[in-house]
Curated annotation (Swiss-Prot):
This is Calcitonin receptor. Residues 187-198, 297-313, 375-394, 449-533 are cytoplasmic. It comes from the Eukaryota. Its main location: membrane. Belongs to the G-protein coupled receptor 2 family. One of its GO terms (biological process) is amylin receptor 3 signaling pathway. It comes from Mus musculus (Mouse). Keywords: Cell membrane, Disulfide bond, G-protein coupled receptor, Glycoprotein, Membrane, Receptor, Signal, Transducer, Transmembrane, Transmembrane helix. The chain crosses the membrane at residues 164-186, 199-219, 274-296, 314-334, 351-374, 395-413, 422-448. GO terms for molecular function: amylin receptor activity; amyloid-beta binding; calcitonin binding; calcitonin gene-related peptide receptor activity; calcitonin receptor activity. Glycans are attached at N45, N90, N142, N147.
Amino acid sequence: MTPRRSRVKRRNLRKPKMRFLLVNRFTLLLLLLVSPTPVLQAPTNLTDSGLDQEPFLYLVGRKKLLDAQYKCYDRIHQLPSYEGEGLYCNRTWDGWMCWDDTPAGATAYQHCPDYFPDFDTAEKVSKYCDENGEWFRHPDSNRTWSNYTLCNAFTSEKLQNAYVLYYLALVGHSLSIAALVASMLIFWIFKNLSCQRVTLHKHMFLTYILNSIIIIIHLVEVVPNGDLVRRDPMHIFHHNTHMWTMQWELSPPLPLSAHEGKMDPHASEVISCKVLHFLHQYMMSCNYFWMLCEGIYLHTLIVMAVFTDEQRLRWYYLLGWGFPIVPTIIHAITRALYYNDNCWLSAETHLLYIIHGPVMVALVVNFFFLLNIVRVLVTKMRQTHEAESYMYLKAVKATMVLVPLLGIQFVVFPWRPSNKVLGKIYDYLMHSLIHFQGFFVATIYCFCNHEVQVTLKRQWTQFKIQWSQRWGRRRRPTNRVVSAPRAVAFAEPDGLPIYICHQEPRNPPISNNEGEESTEMIPMNVIQQDASA
């Protein structure tokens, strides 16, 4: 036989094989499309008038399951034959997951699938291959069986952990509201504390207050509502939508069943829940962008050394209150059109990047602001010829003071560890930082501020004097009554006051309603002050 005839013959032999593979794949795809899914049968009480009337979870779960089933059959045909020794169980699709060839007497493990809201993907599924090279059969049904029982086993430990996180959120946001309201009253009553920096603080404090109120309403009204929670595809989601973790574990969704349908989108509780979620997304975005405003202002004062009162706050107002409404509206419209679950709570959609993308950009920018600010602080401290250890101690203090204000913890710890112990530590750490962040910010930037403390002590002393005079016990005023602008001069040299007051020499002093000169507050005591200030 000539070489040419040999090549033609081999080519002709390949054609039937290629046709067989093409026909086989086409038949497989056709069967997947037309055959009913074995584990997600449509509920009998639903009509076939359209997909809109099918359960929302059924649509989401069925799509994921069909994708996994197609990939499994394709994998079964693509993988080479088993190369091990001895008996083994054949690769198979068990109806939910794909299993490779497994040696006899061994147990295969995989993470639980995410088809169902009550499945914990951190848990494991197991499938046993017996000594005869056959997959384990359940004694009751005599059918091959995979152990999915751990996927939705809500143990007492998980439930207790969920309740701890739930009450941690309630306590944290309640304390934050109380501390922030008290701080706002202090800044509003004592006019000698007024300056541009405090004005920015007030707006950021307001976003914390409103956001905490919305979250408390959500925890009290939405989380206990089983109809809303169980019919939404909920998954653990940690960062800014942190409360969903508690919601998912406290009210675990039911498996797909006949009553598991999408609620009426025009129902009052569904509409109110979506409005609440819209407000939460907006206030959360405002919170982070006011953090960005604080970072821009600090960077302008310290790095660019601009101490003038001419900074126009309207640009900060536009960035803090105006810009976040744009991604929030876009997210609401696209969510209603393309992923309209009951309360827009699901994290199983990339539409969340419309909200989280700008937030992450703001956090990253603030992170670089922090690094640059610390660099400038260290440079200034070196110029003062301080001891090296003390210099870095002050730099660390300055860094830790700025972290809760600028939200840097979300950049430093962006992902939850997969390890169970580390994951639990991460949960408690991040939930404490998130829920108590308003309390921490109010404490650091108001209650621990030296000038605020001096002002409050002076007011308390004046109150005691007036009280004594009212009851006839007149006392001579003590020398503890000092003016707020001069109080900074008595700060301890090893302290780190958050604000340093200075008066712009180019501008005349402006008297407020208490007859005192207004002051501007500059962060960090590393900025040199005029001795006569």
